[in-house]
Regions:
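Sec-dependent N-terminal signal peptides
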Residues: 4-14
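Outer-membrane beta-barrel porins/channels
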Residues: 21-43, 47-53, 69, 77, ...
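Sec/Tat signal peptide C-region and signal peptidase I cleavage site
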Residues: 16-20
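Positively charged n-region of N-terminal signal peptides that target proteins for export
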Residues: 1-4, 142
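N-terminal periplasmic accessory domains that precede
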Residues: 54-66
Length: 202
């Protein structure tokens, strides 16, 4: 009975979404986008289950395991107003260290008119965000898995750029009969290293 109570309690607690940002005050919203069609279709930030989709796994590194050895994932999405998103991920397993994955996520906001104060168009410029991900996942025992992501983030708008570092920490539990799994995750913990405001806008 205690096992069932514990499992139900974990499910209820893990289903509550907590956010560290208030709408409008967050930066690097590219970190909230879904590189995987699977997570986007389910409306989730990450999948708490084990999958063969490396682009979904990279958002929850504790589900990265040896079964994903040499997996490659590529996604491309066309959004509204000329915005497009692409991602590439690859995983490799090392016996003693665990499973590693490399990922790149690209969000292109399209082309914009460059204007003078009076509104005259003098050219065009582009804006884009890039997220580079190094993932690590390891099985502690047959049911418990842990993982972490290191994510450098680069924003490049016209000739201005900004840089940040973020990490994700996660732990997952999978039932012995493999019928259900839960994950606990802290995402996008980090700091902006270089801001747009630190540059000369004249």
């Amino acid at each position: 009975m205690k096992k069932y109570f514990l499992a139900i309690s974990i499910l209820i607690i893990s289903s509550l979404a907590t956010k560290a940002q208030i709408g409008g005050n967050a930066i690097y919203s590219v970190l909230s986008l879904h590189p995987s069609a699977k997570t986007a279709a389910l409306g989730l930030d990450f999948l708490p289950c084990f999958s063969d989709d490396i682009t979904a796994i990279i958002n929850n590194p504790s589900t990265l395991r040896k079964e994903n050895h040499n997996d490659i994932g590529i996604t491309y999405t066309t959004l509204f107003s000329g915005i497009n998103q692409a991602s590439l991920a690859y995983s490799h397993t090392l016996d003693k260290i665990g499973s590693l994955a490399l990922g790149v996520q690209y969000l292109n906001y399209g082309s914009f008119d460059m204007t003078e104060e009076n509104g005259d168009v003098v050219g065009k410029f582009n804006a884009a965000d890039y997220v580079f991900t190094l993932s690590w996942g390891k099985m502690l025992d047959s049911n418990v898995y842990i993982g972490a992501n290191l994510k450098p983030v680069v924003s490049q708008y016209e000739s201005y750029n900004a840089f940040a570092l973020a990490i994700d920490l996660s732990a997952s539990y999978q039932s012995t009969d493999r019928t259900w799994a839960v994950s606990l995750m802290a995402r996008n913990i980090g700091k902006q290293i270089k801001t747009f405001a630190s540059q000369d806008f004249t």
